[in-house]
Amino acid sequence: MSTPTPKVGFVSLGCPKALVDSERILTQLRMEGYEVVPTYEDADVVVVNTCGFIDSAKAESLEVIGEAIAENGKVIVTGCMGVEEHTIRDVHPSVLAVTGPQQYEQVVTAVHEVVPPKTEHNPLVDLVPPQGVKLTPRHYAYLKISEGCNHSCSFCIIPSMRGKLVSRPVGDVLSEAERLVKAGVKELLVISQDTSAYGVDLKYKTDFWNGQPVKTRMKELCEALSSMGVWVRLHYVYPYPNVDDVIPLMAAGKLLPYLDIPFQHASPKVLKAMKRPAFEDKTLARIKQWREICPELTIRSTFIVGFPGETEEDFQYLLDWLTEAQLDRVGCFQYSPVEGAPANELGLEPVPDEVKQDRWERFMAHQQAISAARLQLKVGKEIEVLIDEVDEQGAVGRSWADAPEIDGNVFVDSDELKPGDKVRVRITDADEYDLWAELV
């Protein structure tokens, strides 16, 4: 008589990099015959992959762990907040195991201890696709090229959670990308903590892919990915000089003309306190040069307002810089002290919460006007759109300017499309974030 198939519940919190970690754990569990179920009550054990980047993320992680314990009782915790095991166990002493990020084998071992895998052959194993388990829609996937970061930004604790930069061999990355494309993926989203630094730790070592030598470096990786005939989108690009090397690839249509490049601030004084590159004038000149080479370039960035020591003059400098930069997509966060971050020891004057809120609102209104004006320029133009979903009201897609989850959408007036379709459309309307279009 066969034993019941062991069942695992899984909750993945945080950024796309954590999502890739979840995919890796789930792939291993599926390979061992575990069934992944969508509810707490149907699971033999629940794994929660946490986020620990800022206090609100930690609070959400603790809340979800509590829900899983209440609904199921058997909970294993992993991910970035796992480095603070004492905090987790203080709030939830009944968790069965706590592991940090990237500790895939420890998670799987902890699952084994609660509910062992079946010893006889499980037909579920035969259903695991060659590209592994993916938590994204079939037509796009995140491609993680490295782990960790060599920077010491004073507001950030990622190096203490995920360690120094460790780049994946470029041959492994390209082989994974190839499997994804063969499985029907039409957009590869390249992610890491620092995409620009890819290969630095390996001294840009030459690896091999399909018998051909390829250097472990961002430009060469992008050139190889561009040969696969799918959209390739770069995320988390630190503003190193070598970013200039990939702009011509975008202009030539080999990469999506899209840069996700976190500038964080513009005031030289604030950037210095953040331990970020403080060359804001040169950055403006580079942005201008990038757009001269690739006029279609979309630039997304993130900023922090209310960093300790930020004055009204610093903030106004940032707004003026935004006016000059004319960025397309921008996210903004109010500074929140993070336990263990070097910024806590700088001795700078904290910005009051009400001032942070006021600056955030002014920042968002200022940038919203810029984004709306830039989107308005697209009305009447024809663009290619990748469809994400379709319902009775029409299709929802994205252009080269729109990454999933964080950017806007293109609403297409058609119910004849399906997710994964690439279509030409004409833009008919725009607001601050989204576009409306008709099929060409």
Curated annotation (Swiss-Prot):
Q: Which GO terms describe its biological process?
A: tRNA modification
Give the record's GO CC terms.
cytosol
Q: Where is the Radical SAM core domain?
A: 135-373
Coiled-coil intervals in this record? Answer: none
Molecular-function GO terms, alphabetical:
4 iron, 4 sulfur cluster binding; aspartic acid methylthiotransferase activity; metal ion binding; protein methylthiotransferase activity
What keywords are assigned to this protein? 4Fe-4S, Cytoplasm, Iron, Iron-sulfur, Metal-binding, S-adenosyl-L-methionine, Transferase
Query: What EC class is this?
Result: transferase
Locate the TRAM domain: which residues? 376-440
Database matches in Gene3D superfamilies: Methylthiotransferase, N-terminal domain, Nucleic acid-binding proteins, tm_1862 like domain
UniProt binding sites for [4Fe-4S] cluster 1: 15, 51, 80
Catalytically driven reaction(s): L-aspartate(89)-[ribosomal protein uS12]-hydrogen + (sulfur carrier)-SH + AH2 + 2 S-adenosyl-L-methionine = 3-methylsulfanyl-L-aspartate(89)-[ribosomal protein uS12]-hydrogen + (sulfur carrier)-H + 5'-deoxyadenosine + L-methionine + A + S-adenosyl-L-homocysteine + 2 H(+)
Q: Where is the signal peptide?
A: none
Cofactor(s) listed in the protein's UniProt record: [4Fe-4S] cluster
* Occurrences of domain MTTase N-terminal (ranges): 6-116
The cofactor note from the UniProt entry for this protein is: Binds 2 [4Fe-4S] clusters. One cluster is coordinated with 3 cysteines and an exchangeable S-adenosyl-L-methionine.
Query: Where on the tree of life does the source sit, at the highest rank?
Result: Bacteria
> What Enzyme Commission number(s) apply to this enzyme?
2.8.4.4
Q: What is its main location?
A: cytoplasm
Q: Which residues bind [4Fe-4S] cluster 2?
A: 149, 153, 156
Subcellular location, record wording: Cytoplasm
Q: Does the keyword 4Fe-4S apply?
A: yes
Question: By its UniProt entry, which Pfam families does this protein fall under?
Answer: Radical_SAM, TRAM_2, UPF0004
Q: Which family does it belong to?
A: Belongs to the methylthiotransferase family. RimO subfamily.
Which PANTHER family does its entry note? RIBOSOMAL PROTEIN S12 METHYLTHIOTRANSFERASE RIMO (PTHR43837), RIBOSOMAL PROTEIN US12 METHYLTHIOTRANSFERASE RIMO (PTHR43837:SF1)
Q: What does this protein do?
A: Catalyzes the methylthiolation of an aspartic acid residue of ribosomal protein uS12.
What is the protein name given in its UniProt record?
A: Ribosomal protein uS12 methylthiotransferase RimO
